[in-house]
């Protein structure tokens, strides 16, 4: 796995090998309003049941047409309010829905676009989509302005025995974020307008084969605190008995010093699983020279057969000094279920494929929408 902070690597790589993928991830949180958002653009949608089914059928010679990443672009948006998911929109479609910024950094899927302005050192996001299955339309505009960046590179070409099939580009470890969300009911025209002012993060991932062919599992997380900003990234490579590839990045506000650690000892404990959630460690411990971090995964914000997103509690030692516990965001991924036809069937309940009818998608969103209405009514009562 390659790791880099090179800004030039943020542009679309135009990967065309069957099974290859690329995505651009932004998240932000406004603690004062209890709002957090996640935006992701995909080309070669790495979690698409349609893309991966096509890939497996082509690989098994049951289909002659090879799957091209550009035919499986997509966009997703999640909104969390007071720790509860209120919108989870995922749509994918053909190459006619996707475009990239010519000569620059930025992509578009339908009416959803991000672009990087190097003169202002700013990422501008504009969102415009309808979500009929949940009776919503969403328009939004957001600005991500980096507060600092790291300078780090790990190139597998220079390390014997390490196979490059995935690259992580840490674009913006911390950003000042301003935004406006306009959410409208399609049936009643009721509107909710949310002002956003908070902190955010942006990275970029890409790979040359489906994730389940190269990655066994990974953990990622971040926290912003008064003492430090911290990001960790841990990948257990498939078929590799060696220690996981791990990096820990720290900005110490007390000293102003940035540190990157890639000799990190990793231990997992308190393993658990859910009905449709993969086996994972609820406690993750990371130790490097002069730094140790223990991550306790707490409330699940989003769950699936291969993915979990949590609020987390981090305990840290910097040197000999114990830090106060801080809250963060953590994720876990086990891509193996992505290959399962059964799990692809269930995953299709969350993914709207343009031009494709899915009974699972209709039923899932019907019951989810009904549940949300009951929840809103009960909140008003109490």
From Swiss-Prot:
Keyword terms of this UniProt record:
Carotenoid biosynthesis, Chlorophyll biosynthesis, Oxidoreductase, Photosynthesis
Q: Which domain of life is it from?
A: Bacteria
Provide the E.C. number(s) assigned to this enzyme: 1.-.-.-
SUPFAM superfamilies named among the record's database cross-references: AttH-like
Q: According to the UniProt entry, where is the signal peptide?
A: none
Q: Which GO terms describe its biological process?
A: carotenoid biosynthetic process; chlorophyll biosynthetic process; photosynthesis
GO MF entry, a single one: oxidoreductase activity
Q: Which family does it belong to?
A: Belongs to the CrtC hydratase family.
The name this protein goes by in its record: Hydroxyneurosporene dehydrogenase
Organism placement in taxonomy:
Bacteria, Pseudomonadati, Chlorobiota, Chlorobiia, Chlorobiales
